[in-house]
Swiss-Prot record:
Keywords: DNA-binding, Ethylene signaling pathway, Nucleus, Plant defense, Repressor, Transcription, Transcription regulation. This is Ethylene-responsive transcription factor 3. GO terms for cellular component: nucleus. Residues 1-12, 118-134 have a biased composition (Low complexity). It comes from Nicotiana tabacum. GO terms for molecular function: DNA binding; DNA-binding transcription factor activity. Its main location: nucleus. The gene is ERF3. The AP2/ERF domain binds specifically to the 5'-GCCGCC-3' motif. The affinity of this binding is higher if the seventh amino-acid of this domain is basic. PROSITE patterns: AP2_ERF. CDD domains: AP2. Residues 176-185 have a biased composition (Basic and acidic residues). Residues 27-84 bind DNA. It is found in: Nucleus.
Length: 225
């Protein structure tokens, strides 16, 4: 009786996904293994044409997720990644994904982008088709009223001397102070000149003396003048 050789079943190829001792190693996009056992992740910037360092991780999966997050941030949802993005995460990414909130992305390479608010000018008809990207303009500061115009002073009626009321018209609403002052000055000058006038050398009520003829001639001459 001939003995047939039993066909040996092929042994399954086993190996760890991280490549820490198996015959076959799973390789991820953008991930390299370091000699000391850690995994480094990096990605190529399509705009700057340079490699961006993402960091060193303990496992290949963490490094691959960091690469996937950076690839979606640079190239959008159609970027080639290591792991497929679930529908829920894909919907959130389309709504608005911020790479700074991702724990696997270095925020130093992705600065925060401020939203740009467009504003249309309303003054000119030709500039109505051009959008202004300078952002909302601050409201103009309210104009401060001058203190001189804001303050109101009560005007007191002018003081008019008593002599002016007799000479000026009482029915007129405007009093000319200059004319009144001139008349008052003239009256004062007349009073001063009359009060300080030198007295005569003789009294006209008394008869002239008869003893001196020369004195009579003098008095007669004075009376004629």
């Amino acid at each position: 009786m001939r003995r047939g050789r039993a066909a040996a079943a092929p042994a399954p190829v086993t190996g760890e996904p991280n490549g820490s001792g198996g015959s076959k190693e799973i390789r991820f996009r953008g991930v390299r293994k370091r000699p000391w056992g850690r995994f480094a992740a990096e990605i190529r910037d399509p705009w700057k044409k340079t490699r961006v360092w993402l960091g060193t991780f303990d496992s290949a999966e963490d490094a691959a997720r960091a690469y996937d997050a950076a690839a979606r941030a640079l190239r959008g949802p159609k970027a080639k990644t290591n792991f497929p993005l679930p529908y829920a995460h894909h919907h959130q990414f389309n709504q608005g994904h911020n790479p700074n909130n991702d724990p696997f992305v270095d925020s130093r390479f992705y600065p925060q982008d401020n939203p740009i608010i467009s504003q249309r000018p309303t003054s000119s008809s030709m500039s109505s088709t051009v959008e202004s990207f300078s952002g909302p303009r601050p409201p103009p500061a309210p104009r401060q009223q001058t203190t001189a115009s804001s303050r109101k002073y009560t005007r007191s009626p002018p003081v008019v001397p008593d002599d002016c009321h007799s000479d000026c018209d009482s029915s007129s609403s405007v009093v000319d102070h200059g004319d009144c002052e001139k008349e008052n000055d003239n009256d004062n000058d007349n009073i001063a000149s009359s009060s300080f006038r030198k007295p005569l050398l003789f009294d006209l009520n008394l008869p002239p003396p008869m003893d001196d003829a020369g004195a009579d001639d003098l008095h007669c001459t004075a009376l004629c003048l």
